Amino acid sequence: TDLGVMTQEGKVVHARFDKFRQINRFLEFVEDILPELPKDREVTILDFGCGKSYLTFAMYYYLHELKGYDIRIIGLDLKKDVIKNCSRLAVKYGYDKLNFYEGSIEEFEGVTQVDMVVTLHACDTATDYAMYKALRWGASVILSVPCCQHELNKQIAASEFEPITDYGILKERFCALATDGIRAKILEEQGYDTQILEFIDMEHTPKNLLIRAIHRKKQSDKKKEKAAQQVDAFCKQFGFTPTSVSYTHLTLPTKRI
């Protein structure tokens, strides 16, 4: 009830029903990757762009209280008032390993080892910065629901695709899909099994794709190299220089560090 999703009687607040559905759907994806998380030590999860932290609190309750994991979750957001309120609620509930910090994703250096990185509607290139951090930390799992993929909309330079680029809504949707496709291929390049899945029905949010990446230690070099070549060729064809490429693809080796 403190988060404004449920009433005192345990009913979902009507105006928050879409958010309630999104959080529950995200927890289903978390449940799917539980075999990738260790149970013999503390598990660290980063929630970048946590906002009011509906998902962050739900994950902590689900993993610690219901599944019995020794869990540490860190929520990061730029909004000082939001972080202050979330920190207050964590203390109120006795969640001593649920911590919140104010700051940007690209500048956050508060941990050295992370098991899972999640983002739910981290806007535009914030998803790329979160992905880069996850790779640098060696996260076993990445779950990301991107939004507001505007970057490539300003970059596309392939004149032969005018049947798409001449129409704003088609151009916008194509560039959003291209952004997430490049991200997925970069994760494959770094040794992850990667899927792009439908997050939730469009009626609840138009931002309905989830990138799920699970690291595999025995990923073949050939597969990684193929993914890297596909990224290069695709970006060259359309004149793209996305943050995911400049920040990750060009600065990390093909083998995950």
Label the predicted regions.
Residues T248-T254:
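Conserved small/polar residues in nucleotide/adenosyl-binding loops
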Residues T1-D40:
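Conserved Class I S-adenosyl-L-methionine-dependent methyltransferase catalytic core
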Residues R72-D77:
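Conserved SAM-binding motif I beta-strand of class I
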Residues K52-K67:
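Conserved SAM-binding loop of SAM-dependent methyltransferases across substrates and taxa
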Residues K84-T112:
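S-adenosyl-L-methionine
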Residues C147-A233:
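Substrate-binding/catalytic lobe of Class I Rossmann-like enzymes that use SAM or dcSAM, i.e.
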